[in-house]
A protein has these predicted regions:
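Short amphipathic, positively biased membrane-proximal segments
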Residues: 1-125
């Protein structure tokens, strides 16, 4: 499989995952908060719902942009990469204790940021 086809597949796959995660966080922020942080507070519920809406918008935007070809998709993939990189850094800097939840979030968000950045560079090549 050529790099451009693999980049397109990766971008679409991440967009679909972003829609699923975003929908879950938007519709069930208490559950996602418990899974993510181990607790649920009103502030966490609001933050999770807001981040869920962000991911839902980025994922839907990317999927809709596929109608315009790779050049239309690239900006959405770059925006998603940026959001995931910020999420990874925020969780990395959150607190001094290492937890499995925190480590998993940093790993998943960091990997998504890296793959998205790679795909974005190849989408319009």
């Amino acid at each position: 499989m050529q790099d451009d086809a693999l980049a397109d597949l990766a971008a679409r796959g991440i967009a679909l995952a972003r829609v699923a995660i975003g929908a879950g966080a938007t519709l069930a922020p208490g559950l996602v908060s418990r899974l993510q942080f181990g607790t649920t507070t009103p502030a966490q519920t609001v933050a999770v719902r807001m981040l869920g809406a962000r991911d839902l918008a980025l994922g839907i935007g990317a999927l809709l942009a596929t109608r315009h070809g790779p050049s239309g998709l690239r900006g959405w993939v770059e925006a998603g990469a940026f959001a995931d990189a910020v999420d990874a850094l925020a969780f990395l800097r959150a607190g001094h204790s290492a937890s499995r939840r925190r480590g998993l979030t940093v790993l998943v968000a960091g990997a998504s940021a890296a793959v998205s950045a790679w795909a974005a560079r190849r989408l319009d090549a």
